[in-house]
């Protein structure tokens, strides 16, 4: 927990009055089920103890003033509820702005403005969903301030819509869902097709989740992400000529092997294979956890990375280096890339008394091979977005 009192005094210095309430929204990591969401499959994310804090005070006029301690150089950004358009110079503030606009589009009344101080301890560009964390935070603040009585799943859907339509990023619903619906010590098995979900308790007996950040500047992810989506769509269309399915996620491994010869391009067949096998791996991983078999869960994580590396080809030297070093480290039962790929982070399950040596060794070897240092975060699984004061 960050020192809320320090944030409160920062708020008072900035806005000359005290904050009225405090909110927290977690980041998220996907434990397994990568690039399955848009293929009609399952994902298995959890919310994290790192995230975004917001201190809020209502105003009597229609103006919204926001400031982020993570972007101090931008100062206080101000906009009016009567002119809610995307403005490049507003930078990060377009995320909360998009959520406000989406709520209004759905007929919710936002009668007056407010002041918000944001502070996040999720590294930007790490792939741990700092943007979705801010979106669900803003939705939760609006729901609370104006007594809108919206359930969290609907807040989550509107936040995804804000990112799709206002920001213009074609994301699935996993990030916002994991952040809004998170539960302490549980991961969420989510079917992205139907939004059916269930919680699985993770008994981490003596183990911790360690996130390793490649610190690679992400440039490629968006273009390659769209390319992979279209490759899978083409493969699906070819399979649909012989099999009545709506999504790759509906196939078992055996069914895929029977129909894969319908896919004319071997590259697209590899992409579709990943989508099918990763979805089944995710269901097996959940079953392993329910049977307290953390070792099998770790092996399935490793298999997931191999599939993302060889069949889906979204890893790259930085992620592969972090993962292969983790696989050689004492006390690691599973390691894989997480997120879109081409940079970002890996997720590792590491024995608690091995964490220090794991970080030290992986950092040294990665730095000597790649030329710059990775970062590490030891995290726990958190509740979803909520008011904390």
Curated annotation (Swiss-Prot):
Signal peptide: none annotated. Transmembrane segments: none annotated. The keyword Nucleotide-binding applies. Pfam families: GalKase_gal_bdg, GHMP_kinases_C, GHMP_kinases_N. It catalyses: alpha-D-galactose + ATP = alpha-D-galactose 1-phosphate + ADP + H(+). GO terms for molecular function: ATP binding; galactokinase activity; magnesium ion binding. Mg(2+) binds at residues 131, 163. The record marks 28 as: Transition state stabilizer. InterPro entries: Galactokinase, Galactokinase_bac, Galactokinase_CS, GalKase_N, GHMP_kinase_C_dom, GHMP_kinase_C_sf, GHMP_kinase_N_dom, GHMP_knse_ATP-bd_CS. The active site is at residue 175. ATP binds at residues 68, 125-131. One of its GO terms (cellular component) is cytosol. Keywords: ATP-binding, Carbohydrate metabolism, Cytoplasm, Galactose metabolism, Kinase, Magnesium, Metal-binding, Nucleotide-binding, Transferase. This is Galactokinase. It comes from Clostridium beijerinckii (strain ATCC 51743 / NCIMB 8052). The lineage of its organism: Bacteria, Bacillati, Bacillota, Clostridia, Eubacteriales. The gene is galK.
């Amino acid at each position: 927990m960050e020192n809320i009192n320090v944030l409160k005094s920062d708020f008072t210095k900035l806005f000359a009055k005290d904050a009225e309430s405090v909110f927290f929204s977690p980041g998220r990591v996907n434990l397994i089920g990568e690039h399955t969401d848009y293929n009609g499959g399952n994902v298995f994310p959890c919310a994290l103890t790192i995230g975004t804090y917001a201190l809020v005070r209502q105003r009597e006029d229609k103006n919204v003033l926001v400031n982020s301690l993570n972007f101090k150089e931008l100062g206080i950004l101000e906009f009016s509820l009567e002119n809610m358009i995307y403005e490049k110079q507003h930078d990060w503030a377009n995320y909360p702005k998009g959520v406000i606009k989406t709520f209004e589009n759905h007929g919710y009344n936002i009668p007056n403005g407010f002041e918000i101080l944001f502070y996040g301890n999720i590294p930007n560009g790490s792939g741990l969903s700092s943007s979705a964390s801010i979106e669900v935070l803003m939705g939760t603040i609006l729901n609370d301030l104006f007594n809108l009585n919206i359930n969290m799943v609907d807040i989550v859907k509107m936040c995804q819509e804000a990112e799709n339509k206002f920001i213009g990023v074609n994301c699935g619903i996993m990030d916002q869902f994991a952040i809004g619906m998170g539960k302490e010590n549980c991961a969420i098995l989510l079917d992205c097709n139907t939004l059916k979900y269930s919680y699985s308790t993770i008994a981490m007996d003596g183990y911790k989740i360690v996130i390793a950040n490649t610190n690679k500047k992400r440039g490629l992810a968006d273009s390659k992400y769209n390319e992979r989506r279209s490759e899978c769509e083409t493969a699906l269309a070819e399979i649909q000529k012989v099999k009545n399915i709506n999504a790759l996620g509906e196939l078992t491994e055996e069914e895929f092997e029977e129909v894969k010869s319908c896919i004319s391009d071997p590259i697209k067949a590899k992409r579709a294979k990943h989508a099918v096998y990763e979805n089944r791996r995710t269901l097996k991983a959940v079953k392993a956890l329910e049977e307290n078999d953390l070792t099998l869960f770790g092996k399935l994580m490793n298999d997931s990375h191999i599939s993302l590396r060889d069949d889906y080809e979204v890893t790259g030297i930085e992620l592969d280096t972090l993962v292969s070093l983790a696989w050689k480290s004492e006390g690691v039962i599973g390691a894989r890339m997480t997120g879109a790929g081409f940079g970002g982070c890996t997720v590792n399950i590491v024995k608690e008394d091995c964490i220090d040596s794991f970080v030290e060794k992986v950092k040294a070897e990665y730095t000597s091979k790649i030329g710059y240092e990775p970062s590490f975060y030891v995290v726990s699984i958190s509740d979803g977005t909520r008011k904390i004061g």
